[in-house]
Amino acid sequence: MLSVTINDGVVKASSLKRKDNSSSDKSNYKLVRKGDIAYNSMRMWQGASGTSPYSGIVSPAYTIITPINNIVVDFFAYQFKMKSSLYKFQKYSQGLTSDTWNLKFPLLREIKMIAPNKNEQIKIVCLLKKLDSTIASNQRHPFLLKIRPRPPP
């Protein structure tokens, strides 16, 4: 059983410190394959999406996107987290209030996303992953960052 979170994307539901409220009948649950993008249609505008590092199942409330040729799935996973994309997702979501906003796939498909060629997508993803790794490392070891006062003129 997998879950989609805002901060961590697709994770094993067992890794979350939540009560399992899933149905005992999983026949309507959706299959996710490693490399698919899964998103929570009611929270896409908040960034509840991610590339799945696992194969498994998710709640029927989630939407699964299977990548096609010439698409680097992680490129779009990063793009889906950008503020400009979140704004578009909010704009295209349907519902009266933020509690009921919903972005189903037919509407998501209408949103224009710009993507360079596949090689550029790969380069961009590599750079962003290195930045993520550096940021995570610095957050784990804040003592490595020292603020030095500016020398007097």
What does each model-found stretch correspond to?
Residues 1-153:
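Feature detects amphipathic, helix-rich regulatory segments
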